[in-house]
Amino acid sequence: MNKNFDKLNYNIINVIVYSISKNDYPTSNNLKVYQYSFVNFKPSLEMSQIIKKKKLDSSSSEDFIPTKRITTLEELENYERLEERTKVTITKEKIPLFAKNEMFRNIVRHSLNSPECRENQESDQKTYILKRWDLLPLPLRDLITNESIDHSTVTHKVKYEDITPEEAFKLVVNDDIGVMVGFETVGHIAHLNVPEERSSIKKLIAKIIIDVRAFEVTAFRNTNILKLTMDIELLAGEENYVANLVENGLKFEVDFANVYWNSRLVKERTRIRDLLDSDDIVVDMFAGAGPFAIYASKKGCSENYMKRNAKINKVTGLVKVFNMDGREFLIDVIKKNKILDKNTLEYDKMALKPTGRVHLIMNLPKIAIEFLGSLVINHTSSDTLVGLADNIEEENIRRFMVHCYCFSGSNEYENEIEQRLSKSIGTKLPEYTITNVRGVSPKKQMYCIEFECPVSILRGKKE
């Protein structure tokens, strides 16, 4: 094991979950997922699909070329420009005819086009402001020429609140490689991943995202990717990092300032849930807000927010929460209380069934492999090895399933992961599987290593 990790004290939330009901869990029909989005205004069609703006287009975003780059929030908020528009007056009876020829797809944000103005217009004539004449479809132009009462070119002032997301991003980005900012949304929060190339305009990008997506009122980025919890930099909106969300029918309350959460792991959480049997026991070594634990307990199988989420989902009696070093947790809770013993039928008023397997979930991919060495502990006072189940008769040891997450950027990731596994545990595993969970970056993937821990290792023997 890497000695540098031995010296570190990881005060990480740990949890034990027991499953009781095989049928009482949400199905994929209740799926409500907050997914990862990547913002890129090129081509604009993809952007419009990613970000829905409940405003009328001011003009064609594809044809818009800014004359000056905006560099400050004040400039963005006070932005305005003059554009040519087409003013059209028609009779009420011809509205269906013009609608059929896409007139209402080509109107722009203007007071004359507001529902209030149209409703209060007592005349049998209606006036609309459309896009610039040369941007209108040819059939519509012909119809206007032949069937309108009047049409003319007018000058219209366009402000920041009138423009499309594509136009807004073009105002702050002075190249053609796109915005390059990934973000995921959880409740009212947008978590931005801002590369160094865009750090100078991070607050401008955050403001545009907040203004476009009205349900989000907070945008932040994590300034320390090496820590499990985040060092938050508020980029736009309110300083409110407690989000409420629904995932696969389960309700969660997450404080981003103190607890790590990743909505992109929803499929992985579902996969792990589906591996569990109703009698199984789940040991979540790095539990955070408790997503894996809540999934498991609902199927039947930051400490404060874990408890709150257990209460919200009505599984308080099935979840036991600890806040301690991960290695100490395995020894002081799992080993000393003989959780791996089939004869242990109760722990802290929580019933355990002898047929249940124990699942150890280690979702701290940066260093989780280093903690696998805790399955066999080498006492400093002697050369003797101590396993998690060396105090249990061999025939009474529960099946112990390990789900350990890691990162790898190697093309030969199987060999690289195998070397790290063998180094940490001190022996070569006879059998294991590696599942590709998700892409973290173009050169890094997240994997889940899964194996049934051999009894020899649990008994402190490295063969």
UniProtKB/Swiss-Prot annotation:
S-adenosyl-L-methionine binds at R269, D325, G326, N363. It comes from Theileria annulata. Belongs to the class I-like SAM-binding methyltransferase superfamily. TRM5/TYW2 family. It is found in: Mitochondrion matrix; Nucleus; Cytoplasm. HAMAP family: TRM5 (MF_03152). GO terms for biological process: mitochondrial tRNA methylation; tRNA N1-guanine methylation. Keywords: Cytoplasm, Methyltransferase, Mitochondrion, Nucleus, S-adenosyl-L-methionine, Transferase, tRNA processing. One of its GO terms (molecular function) is tRNA (guanine(37)-N1)-methyltransferase activity. Monomer. The keyword Transferase applies. This is tRNA (guanine(37)-N(1))-methyltransferase. Its EC number is 2.1.1.228. Specifically methylates the N1 position of guanosine-37 in various cytoplasmic and mitochondrial tRNAs. Methylation is not dependent on the nature of the nucleoside 5' of the target nucleoside. This is the first step in the biosynthesis of wybutosine (yW), a modified base adjacent to the anticodon of tRNAs and required for accurate decoding. It catalyses: guanosine(37) in tRNA + S-adenosyl-L-methionine = N(1)-methylguanosine(37) in tRNA + S-adenosyl-L-homocysteine + H(+). It is an enzyme of class 2 (transferase). GO terms for cellular component: mitochondrial matrix; nucleus.
